[in-house]
């Protein structure tokens, strides 16, 4: 608000320089920058422009631009003091809005000021002055109209005070407010502006809240759409209760909203006693029905009076909305629990595992169907054999005893000639072989799988390898624990004892005895190729694929898969017979050397070959047959990083000279210093850690290096010292080049490891050996020094 105060430093307003005379003034009457008024005064046009800017109020002050220079107010003060109440009725339009200057510029403010006589020229009308005054009045009315439109509160406050144009002079009865009241009004207006800014900030946050509400509604719709399940009927039965609960929540929210509006309806009155009541249109803004679909108020042009009320009620209603949202959360969570894994999708690993299981089941179904067909054929053959004349029963029984060893051939009935009695009774032997398959010896893939390499798992951190018959074997590879970390490694479990019993199965019956009494039949069987027609056809197809330049491809996998299944079934079971393996090897060798090398070195999903399985099961006779082929890869490592040579170091052959000969032959054909891919251990370290003294001696005879270090920097001597194997330590110390000063990755020697493990005997032996070595070096060094001195 502009407030004009009389400046006491102005010159005398009644002096001669303000009136035109013969001597002239600072400005000439004809100057284009001044206008002569009807009272004979000259008004500066710049001063009139300055007055107009003051009258326009805050709108003009907010306009950017360079500030105007303030001119002296002498002419306006002189004009206000010299005018008469009735001469110029629109003189108050040039006063300020608060009316404070009108009292200071009233005619009675300067009683001693005498007016000069009016000149004849002052009585004449000046069109330029009238045009200027009319333009000023028009602009003032426009500014006041705009201000009333933008701020109704200020317009209501200003409404009791007249503009001055409706009355010729101010009424002394209506006294203008004092400076204290005006200052209080200004403070209230400043507080209202600050509150308005705060509410505007809150209004800016409304779109974000509305966006969150829309997102929650979309999420709720998505969850409701995903509830299409077989138990949807139960959901429909429980839906009325939920709808009733939602209705109750809605009623509570509406009640709280009405309470908030009723609490927010009163409004403080201003100091002038004028209460700014809220209009009905402002209340409609709070009604949810009066909002647009986006949530914005429909009447945003209601001015500053409506905006504070709307924002204030929203700010108070936010906690209620948050409370309702918290109560609705359990419903959303309950809907989320109805989403099953079918809608979310299974992980890729689970899908792959399910696919492998499906493939395995399909394969087992096919094998079962094949076995059922063979069983039906053999039952028919058995019935035919039973109905034979009694005179042939004796020969049939004798032939049965002789041909029981040929049950693994599985020759079909229709392909066997039937001229002799022995050939007629061949189906009976085949029937017995199929019954063994039903018990789980050759064909039960699920029962024999986990037993493969079982003792290796017990002795080496539960390493397990699945059966070779299962094309989709588990990927449990790797030794979980370092052998040095388990002190119980020397104690063989049941799996180890099973592996330690070499040789074929001891379950011999009368048929085996009769087989030994008929050498001519055995010789005749050995000359035959032990391949059934189905396996023979697959081997021929596989041999043709191997002879091609591109080799075996993925599209040619049927023959290779069949050969692998039959090969592992015959050679890699715990009860596999060396005779059957020998027959298959002869049949494969007759088809070609490339096929023989391919079949002997076939590996399953875990990287285990027939040599791995035969060594781990203790079937060293089969291992000898595989080594006799001359194409067996002895150094092939499985996925756990172990070769058949390393597995042989874990077995215990006892007093069996033949098995020890096979083990020594295996050690001599392979690399005894090869390291496991995961732990870096050698066969010597494995044999020492499991307490197989005979294998340690055999490895040392084959040239095993005692100073080789594993991934942790440990040597074979450190392993023996840690486990307290005194005999092994003596055997290692007897080897030439055994270094006791080697340190592992932690900077520990074999002597320190023995002391830490409280192996006193081993520590004493190592200390004595170190002392003897130092004394020997010193004794051999002194004569050399003496000879040097003599020379």
Curated annotation (Swiss-Prot):
This is KN motif and ankyrin repeat domain-containing protein 3. PROSITE patterns: ANK_REP_REGION (PS50297), ANK_REPEAT (PS50088). May be involved in the control of cytoskeleton formation by regulating actin polymerization. GO terms for cellular component: cytoplasm. Residues 25-34, 401-410, 772-783 have a biased composition (Polar residues). The modification Phosphoserine is found at residues 151, 159, 163, 166-167, 176, 279. InterPro entries: Ankyrin_rpt (IPR002110), Ankyrin_rpt-contain_sf (IPR036770), KANK1-4 (IPR047184), KN_motif (IPR021939). GO terms for biological process: negative regulation of actin filament polymerization; negative regulation of stress fiber assembly. Keywords: ANK repeat, Coiled coil, Phosphoprotein, Repeat. ANK repeats lie at residues 606-636, 640-677, 679-708, 712-742, 746-775. Residues 105-125, 158-180, 485-496 have a biased composition (Low complexity). Residues 127-149, 254-280, 293-312, 505-514 have a biased composition (Basic and acidic residues).
């Amino acid at each position: 608000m502009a407030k004009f105060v009389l400046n006491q430093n102005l010159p005398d307003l009644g002096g001669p320089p303000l009136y035109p005379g013969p001597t002239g003034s600072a400005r000439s009457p004809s100057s284009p920058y001044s206008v002569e008024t009807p009272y004979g005064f000259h008004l500066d046009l710049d001063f009139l422009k300055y007055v107009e800017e003051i009258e326009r109020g805050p709108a003009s002050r907010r306009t950017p631009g360079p500030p105007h220079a303030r001119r002296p107010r002498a002419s306006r003060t002189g004009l206000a003091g010299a005018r008469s109440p009735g001469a110029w009725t629109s003189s108050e339009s040039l006063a300020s809005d608060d009316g404070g200057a009108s009292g200071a510029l009233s005619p009675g403010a300067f009683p001693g000021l005498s007016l000069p006589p009016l000149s004849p020229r002052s009585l004449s009308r000046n069109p330029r002055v009238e045009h200027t005054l009319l333009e000023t009045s028009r602009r003032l009315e426009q500014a006041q109209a705009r201000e009333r439109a933008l701020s109704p509160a200020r317009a209501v406050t200003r409404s009791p005070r007249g503009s001055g144009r409706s009355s010729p002079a101010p009424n002394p009865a209506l006294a203008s407010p004092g400076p204290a009241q005006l200052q209080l009004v200004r403070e209230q207006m400043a507080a209202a502006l600050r509150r308005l800014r705060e509410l505007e900030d809150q209004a800016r946050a409304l779109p974000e809240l509305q966006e969150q509400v829309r997102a929650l509604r979309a999420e709720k719709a998505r969850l409701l759409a995903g509830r299409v399940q077989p138990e949807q009927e139960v959901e429909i039965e429980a839906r009325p209760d939920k709808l009733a609960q939602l209705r109750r929540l809605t009623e509570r929210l509406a009640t709280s909203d009405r309470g908030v509006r009723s609490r927010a309806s009163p409004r403080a009155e201003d100091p002038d006693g004028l209460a700014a009541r809220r209009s009905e249109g402002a209340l409609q803004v709070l009604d949810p029905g009066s909002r647009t679909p986006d949530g914005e108020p429909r009447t945003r042009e209601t001015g500053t009076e409506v905006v504070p009320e709307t924002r204030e009620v929203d700010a108070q209603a936010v906690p209620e909305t948050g409370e309702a949202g918290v109560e609705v959360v359990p419903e959303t969570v309950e809907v989320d629990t109805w989403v099953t894994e079918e809608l979310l999708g299974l992980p890729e690993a689970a899908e792959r595992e399910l696919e492998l299981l499906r493939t395995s089941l399909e394969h087992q179904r096919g094998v079962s169907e094949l076995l059922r067909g063979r069983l039906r054929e053999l039952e028919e053959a058995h019935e035919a054999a039973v109905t034979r004349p009694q005179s042939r029963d004796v020969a049939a029984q004798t032939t049965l005893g002789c041909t029981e060893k040929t049950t693994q051939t599985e020759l079909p009935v229709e392909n066997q000639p039937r001229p002799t009695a022995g050939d007629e009774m061949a189906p009976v032997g085949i029937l017995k072989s199929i019954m063994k398959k039903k018990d789980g010896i050759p064909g039960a893939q699920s029962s024999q799988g986990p037993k493969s390499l079982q003792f290796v798992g017990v002795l080496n951190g539960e390493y397990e390898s699945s059966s070779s018959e299962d094309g989709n074997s588990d990927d449990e590879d790797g030794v979980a624990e370092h052998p040095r970390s388990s002190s119980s490694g020397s104690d063989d479990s049941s799996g180890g004892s099973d592996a330690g019993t070499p040789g074929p199965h001891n379950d011999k019956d009368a048929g085996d005895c009769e087989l030994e009494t008929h050498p001519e039949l055995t010789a005749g069987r050995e000359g035959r190729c032990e391949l059934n027609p189905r396996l023979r056809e697959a081997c021929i197809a596989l041999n043709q694929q191997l002879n091609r330049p591109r080799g075996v491809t993925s599209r040619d996998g049927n023959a290779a898969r069949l050969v692998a299944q039959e090969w592992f079934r015959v050679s890699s079971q715990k009860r596999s017979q060396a005779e059957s393996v020998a027959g298959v090897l002869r049949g494969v060798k007759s088809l070609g050397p490339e096929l023989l090398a391919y079949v002997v070195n076939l590996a399953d999903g875990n990287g285990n070959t027939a040599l791995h399985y035969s060594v781990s099961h203790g079937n060293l006779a089969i291992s000898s047959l595989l080594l006799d082929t001359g194409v067996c890869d002895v150094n092939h490592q499985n996925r756990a990083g172990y070769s058949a040579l390393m597995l042989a170091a874990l077995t215990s052959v006892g007093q069996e000279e033949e098995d020890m000969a096979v083990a020594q032959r295996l050690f001599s054909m392979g690399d005894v210093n090869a390291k496991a891919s995961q732990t870096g251990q050698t066969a010597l370290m494995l044999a020492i850690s499991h307490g197989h003294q005979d294998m340690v001696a055999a490895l040392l005879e084959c040239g095993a290096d005692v100073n080789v270090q594993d991934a942790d920097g440990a040597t074979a001597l450190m392993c023996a010292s840690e486990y307290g194997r005194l005999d092994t330590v003596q055997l290692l110390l007897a080897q030439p080049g055994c270094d006791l000063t080697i340190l592992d990755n932690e900077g520990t020697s074999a002597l320190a490891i023995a002391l830490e493990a409280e192996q006193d005997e081993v520590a004493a032996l190592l200390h004595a050996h170190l002392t003897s070595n130092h004394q020997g070096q010193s004794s051999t060094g002194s004569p050399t020094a003496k000879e040097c001195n003599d020379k």
